UniProtKB/Swiss-Prot annotation:
Homodimer; disulfide-linked. GO terms for cellular component: plasma membrane. It comes from the Eukaryota. Residues 495-559 are cytoplasmic. The chain crosses the membrane at residues 474-494. Keywords: Angiogenesis, Cell membrane, Disulfide bond, Glycoprotein, Membrane, Signal, Transmembrane, Transmembrane helix. Residues 21-473 are extracellular. The gene is eng. One of its GO terms (molecular function) is glycosaminoglycan binding. This is Endoglin. Disruption phenotype: Viable, with survival to adult stages. Brain tissue shows widespread vascular malformations with localized widening of blood vessels. During embryogenesis, blood vessel connectivity between the dorsal aorta (DA), intersegmental vessels (ISVs) and posterior cardinal vein (PCV) appears normal at 72 hours post-fertilization (hpf). However, blood flow through ISVs is significantly reduced. Blood vessel pruning is increased, probably due to aberrant hemodynamics. Arterial ISVs have a slightly increased diameter, while venous ISVs have greatly reduced diameter. The keyword Transcription does not apply. Residues 536-546 have a biased composition (Low complexity). It comes from Danio rerio (Zebrafish).
Amino acid sequence: MKSICCVLVLCLLLCRRSTASESICELKDVSGNSNDWIVLREKPLGCWTDFQTENGTEVHIINLEDNPSVFTVNLLKANKSVVIFTSSSAQSSHAMLFDNPAVSIYVTNKTSLTFIHPTQKPLQILTAPPAGNVSAVLRWAAETFGGVTSVTNARNPKTITFTGVKGSQNSSRCELMPETPTEKPFIHLELNEPIEALKSCYMKHEGEKLHIINIPDGVTIRHVSVHLLSDCNVVLRGPAGTHWIIKNSLRIGILSNNQIHLQSFPLRPRMAISDNPTDIRQKALSYFSSGFISSYSEIRLNVTNVELWITDYSISSAPTEVEKTTPSPTSPPFPVQMQLFSSPDFTTPIDNNSRVLSDKRVYAEISSQTFREASIRVSSCWVRSTPVTREMPFREEPCFIKDCPKRLSFSFQILQDLPAGSWDLECAVKLCGVKRINNEESCTSETPVKRNVQVKPFTPTTNSCFEFGLSAVLGIAFGGFLIGVLLTGALWFIKIRTGHPVALGMRSTAAELSVLSISGCPCGLTKRQPVPTHPSPSENSSANASIGSTQSTPTSSMA
């Protein structure tokens, strides 16, 4: 029973180890440190100048690392020169030498190097003082010969050949800097490629690319120059003290546990990441909210400086030679983007085909996925449409979220007098951050960020009310007067024809007209009084007589 349990535990441990190493994908050795999606190059310390002594002698220093047992040195085409061999390795090496009488050979003390001379001619090997490193040899050579033409690092060489081509460098002082030895025209190096220096795997998928570079703990790499040849997200993980430098300026997202410089702008480590692939995978997918990883690579090259190129995998375009990549003149020095919104809560984005009315306020969000912790400063904005350019006033909008982008708002009222068209909204921005060493603020140079927007002038709606001019007012007044005269005449005529007495007079007519003018109706708002009837004078006398007789009768009867 115990044996069965032990076997099960052992199987579980093996499965767990296998799962941890292949949790992302199955790693494979990259032959020559180059394939379709990743290229790795060593960047050893070296230098190259145009120095020559007074008699035209060049001075070259060859630093041997990981000495092979046998290699070849070809000096047949070399110019008149001094060649100094040095190595910090205790391993013995033998060099097959094709010498040149115009070349003097020096070997530093404690460098175990033996030359094999095919012609068996006497060979004079001069001894240089012992040196602990290349810098010390460089100082000794500069003091002895007055200067140094070149310092070249040769790691595990097969052949070292001097071509005799003259260099064309302007500098006369040799200062050690990371370099690519193959760029020197006067020397050709053929090196033995290190074994298992680079392992990588690639997984094709649609959507945004995510690349992971892992330098396991214990590897001595400390400086990595990275070239990203397309927009992507990248995880850069290395031992403590590793420094990453990103050379280009694409729209990229970065996650790292080390210090990063992007276009000379420092980025602080985001989070602690172990060299375990499972931990890296989990944190990468969570940080970028992604479901896929495009490539995973492990670098185990024990050198100080390396250079790395990463691109999208394409069967039709496999990079066999690495070309120098220089930013295009139109590309910004750092990746920033601008998004436009139609609402002050920045939740309704404006697409490129939408038209914005000039009387509406537009809200802009300027952000950098790469520099999330950096503050963005906007100095000025303008709109441009050939050949018109106008300054664009803006207002900063508040933001209360973590790592908030820069928020602004604009009004296109300044374009109200221009026809509808396409405009480039452009702002000059710079990124600012605090240096980790001295806590001083550091800002990038200003760079433009722009977004195209379709602007349509605002057209107010037409008023449906009538507008009267002076002539219309005078015409209405005269018409009202004429209607009043006609109505007055008509009323007067009606009164005469119906037998109304003159006693009605003008007062009654005036009263009716006043009611008419006030109420707008002949009936008026007041109750009309009954019209008394007045008899003619003849009738009036007889009436008086009858009244008088009538009044006397009751008197007599009562009497």
